[in-house]
Regions:
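Active-site pre-lysine segment of PLP-dependent enzymes
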Residues: 1-18, 28-60
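PLP-dependent enzyme catalytic core of the Aspartate aminotransferase-like
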Residues: 169, 186-226
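Active-site-adjacent capping/gating segments
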Residues: 47, 160-164, 174-202
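Conserved glycine-rich beta-strand-loop-beta hairpin in the small C-terminal domain of fold type I
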Residues: 100, 116-127, 139-153, 163-166
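Active-site PLP attachment segment
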Residues: 43-82, 94
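Structural signature of PLP-dependent enzymes
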Residues: 81-84, 105-127, 157
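Short hydrophobic/aromatic beta-strand micro-patches
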Residues: 71, 151-153, 196-198
Length: 226
């Protein structure tokens, strides 16, 4: 969401103080490459602003930590402390306190900087492999600047069903953008692969481009014979 649109949303919430709150799920915001990170709504609004900020450490650290967190605006914090003062979470206090010290000591910031460098190099290697395996007129890449996945849109694509079958045949774990189209009306989603690279070994990036090319060729040949 552009910064101008974020400001409009905050202005909308501010017109009804105490009655309108924005829930901001800032998933994957830590991983933004090539451009400066956009400010969060919570950061723009300040501690008294109408934003409830949610995030998790499942990507930035590890899913096994099982820790998410919430930043409440001060007008809601007192009510939350009163209502949930006896609440006991499923994560031990030892893990919570360890993470808190990891963050306040500046270690988390340095950890994220190292992760961004590593993931950017991995993304660049995957993009280079795709551009080597596919001609420019065959494939368009999008969503390269943030998150740990990218979109590979095939030009003149075979049916998505053929792509799914070929992916199983070649042992490729990837989603199709149409899997997220609940209405089935987004025609632009057809033939678009969602390629996650967070857990892709660096040494496998080149082979990934070649395998995807074979997958797409097999899907197109299979659809032509039907």
């Amino acid at each position: 969401m552009p910064a101008g649109r974020r400001a409009e949303l905050l202005h909308w919430a501010a017109r009804a103080p105490g009655r309108r709150y924005i829930i901001e799920d800032d998933y994957d915001s830590e991983f933004r490459f090539d451009t400066r990170p956009l400010p969060s709504l919570q950061g723009m609004a300040g501690a008294d602003g109408p934003v409830v900020y949610l995030s998790t450490c499942s990507r930035s650290l590890a899913p096994g930590i099982r820790i998410a967190y919430m930043v409440l605006p001060r007008p809601l914090l007192g009510a939350w402390q009163e209502k949930y003062r006896l609440y006991s979470g499923t994560v031990g206090r030892f893990e919570q306190q360890t993470l808190a010290r990891f963050i306040t000591g500046g270690y988390f910031t340095r950890h994220l900087a190292r992760e961004r460098t590593a993931y950017k190099a991995r993304r660049d290697a995957l993009v280079a492999a795709l551009r080597t395996s596919f001609a420019p007129e065959e494939l368009t890449l999008a969503g390269l600047h943030t998150g740990l996945h990218l979109l590979a849109q095939l030009k003149d694509p075979p049916p998505d069903a053929a792509l799914r079958a070929a992916a199983r045949q070649y042992g490729v774990r990837c989603a199709l953008l149409s899997d997220y189209d609940l209405t089935g009306t987004a025609h632009s989603a057809v033939g678009t692969l969602v390629l996650g690279y967070g857990s892709l070994p660096d040494a496998d990036c080149a082979a990934a481009g070649e395998r995807l090319k074979k997958l797409c060729t097999a899907a197109r040949e299979a659809s032509d014979t039907v």
